[in-house]
Amino acid sequence: MKEILRRALTGVLYVIILLSAVFLNSDAFDFLFMVFGLACLYEFKRLTHLKGYYIFIAYLGLWWAYIYLVSDTTLITLLMLLTITINLALLAFLFSKKETPFNTVQKFIIGLFYIGGGCIFLTMIPYKHNGFSKFLIMGIFIIIWVSDTFAYFVGKSIGKTKLYPSVSPKKTIEGSIGGLVFALIAAYFLSLIHI
């Protein structure tokens, strides 16, 4: 019960902060996701024991350049390819038997493109047709929240088969399927609304 209450309160706070930023103005939204990126990098740095603050400087420089300066689709595509490549490499590493630790340069590159690249493209999502689409980004987050919420409740109620115990001991296959199904339902209803 305490865990559900904690999750609910955290979720409500998160929703309030996000809604405030989205509906205040585009600059507030940009700033919020820049800060989210810094927070994620701080946690990544702590978990991987990456020393120094160069990664924060590199992230801020990359974020600023791509959000406010770069408009060339070739450069944007290049960053996207780098980000996707790092994601696929991490996925392959996750399912491999290797236990070779990452060196400092690898940690830096992973943090910059896995986290930094992800935050940059997340920040870009609502900017379509030279405008700021509040409801597009809200629709995406609604789908994420629905998926997360129902994955939790389905997993708690009928979940038996562990998904990946060494990474997340409590997550189950049943919960993941439940989250996916309800996310698709939410996406369908949101598709009926023009955003």
Predicted regions and their residues:
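Membrane-embedded alpha-helical bundles of polytopic integral membrane proteins
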Residues: 1-172, 176-192
